Amino acid sequence: MSNRFAVILAAGKGTRMKSKLYKVLHPVCGKPMVQHVVDQVSQLGLQKLVTVVGHGAEMVQEQLGNVSEFALQAEQLGTAHAVDQAAGVLANEEGTTLVICGDTPLITAETMEALLQQHKEAGAMATVLTAYIEEPAGYGRIVRNENGHVEKIVEHKDANEKELAIKEINTGTYCFDNKALFASLSKVSNDNVQGEYYLPDVIEILKNEGHIVSAYQTEHFDETLGVNDRVALSQAEIIMKNRINRKNMVNGVTIIDPSNTYISADAIIGSDTVLHPGTIIEGNTVIGSDCEIGPHTVIRDSEIGDRTTIRQSTVHDSKLGTEVSVGPFAHIRPDSVIGDEVRVGNFVEIKKTVFGNRSKASHLSYIGDAQIGEDVNLGCGSITVNYDGKNKFKTVIGNGVFIGCNSNLVAPVTVEDGAYVAAGSTITENVPSKALSVARARQVNKEDYVDQLLNKKKS
């Protein structure tokens, strides 16, 4: 196999997005568009990948890291000019170069591989990725010769009646013989209304020199969608969402209502897990097998163990063990580690806490900056008082501890193994192992007080 290279065009301003965010960094199913493209082209066995950047170059470089080399297009003078900025990296290389736009997040490695194979089999100097659509208005038409090769690409505004009837269109993705590509770029003129250098002109140059220009027609037009505004962004989101949901269902995940379930592109979900409507799974979340998630649950960048149930709750940047029950209406905030067989009930908030196996906080509790042992019961209304207005402090609760309802644990404080805290207590000092701590005012009953009070009011 000859050397393979790729150039991703990611320098456009994205004016129609009307956004401060660089166009190719707009997310589709939680991942920036250009990252989708890079992840797919990286599966093609490339020797070099060059991303052409312009406005917001630093942000794109930060997103992609060392996966790609970069070339700067300081002034946007057209697609041919953009590719030419990669000459410093690629011009002297022998092989085949794929050119693709960074705003086509739906393209797949399979389609690009088929394009490259067609290019090789045809012995072509250039090959165009095309698609067939019933309503091709606005697209450049592919005119083929008697051998099935590309005779020319005609823009919609320049097409005659016969050419307008053609329904095979140019998608804007190409592959070229690398040396022929960079030799031809120097011949491209900007003699047009926009005064720009257009990459399709390379096709005409190669054709006029007698080279074969081939085409590969994909059956999946939606893969070629270029995102230039928020409308197209929403279309890409829907297509990608459906693709991800279908993949998960084929792999054994039950999605009750796919139209009302969102799964990020990088999430991994085990078989026999059930996702109820309103479930949103974001980032690099990993969910085990036999789980039940939702309805109306958000999980972001978290790891969920097997046979765990999460209902009407939010989990962010945390790790949950096996057979955990969360919700309804619980909030597990970042840097929390929840053990196995734990119960986190309704209206419980946990933040930056290690929660031991088989422990439970069944309702109406806040546990922050804490270390909770195993087999602990936190009664209704248990609160770790972790913040003094300036600093955060840690609460440590040992194994087998019982915290009664409506108790405040004022950190820094430790409740040792096996201790009990009486309901209604405010604990400000450490509690020894197996001790009962009572920190509340003694109850006083005043006999006949109400009658005396009412009689006094009447007099």
UniProtKB/Swiss-Prot annotation:
The gene is glmU. Residues 252-459 are annotated as: N-acetyltransferase. GO terms for cellular component: cytoplasm; membrane. The lineage of its organism: Bacteria, Bacillati, Bacillota, Bacilli, Bacillales. Pathway: Nucleotide-sugar biosynthesis; UDP-N-acetyl-alpha-D-glucosamine biosynthesis; N-acetyl-alpha-D-glucosamine 1-phosphate from alpha-D-glucosamine 6-phosphate (route II): step 2/2; Nucleotide-sugar biosynthesis; UDP-N-acetyl-alpha-D-glucosamine biosynthesis; UDP-N-acetyl-alpha-D-glucosamine from N-acetyl-alpha-D-glucosamine 1-phosphate: step 1/1; Bacterial outer membrane biogenesis; LPS lipid A biosynthesis. Its EC number is 2.7.7.23, 2.3.1.157. Keywords: Acyltransferase, Cell shape, Cell wall biogenesis/degradation, Cytoplasm, Magnesium, Metal-binding, Multifunctional enzyme, Nucleotidyltransferase, Peptidoglycan synthesis, Repeat, Transferase. Binds 1 Mg(2+) ion per subunit. NCBIfam families: glmU (TIGR01173), PRK14354.1 (NF010934). GO terms for biological process: cell morphogenesis; cell wall organization; lipid A biosynthetic process; peptidoglycan biosynthetic process; regulation of cell shape; UDP-N-acetylglucosamine biosynthetic process. It catalyses: alpha-D-glucosamine 1-phosphate + acetyl-CoA = N-acetyl-alpha-D-glucosamine 1-phosphate + CoA + H(+); N-acetyl-alpha-D-glucosamine 1-phosphate + UTP + H(+) = UDP-N-acetyl-alpha-D-glucosamine + diphosphate. Residues 231-251 are annotated as: Linker. It is found in: Cytoplasm. UDP-N-acetyl-alpha-D-glucosamine binds at residues 9-12, 23, 73, 78-79, 140, 155, 170, 228, 333, 351, 366, 377. Residues 1-230 are annotated as: Pyrophosphorylase. It holds the Pfam family NTP_transferase. GO terms for molecular function: glucosamine-1-phosphate N-acetyltransferase activity; magnesium ion binding; UDP-N-acetylglucosamine diphosphorylase activity. HAMAP family: GlmU. It comes from the Bacteria. Its main location: cytoplasm. In the N-terminal section; belongs to the N-acetylglucosamine-1-phosphate uridyltransferase family. Mg(2+) binds at D103, N228. CDD domains: GT2_GlmU_N_bac (cd02540), LbH_GlmU_C (cd03353). Homotrimer. This is Bifunctional protein GlmU. The keyword Ribonucleoprotein does not apply.
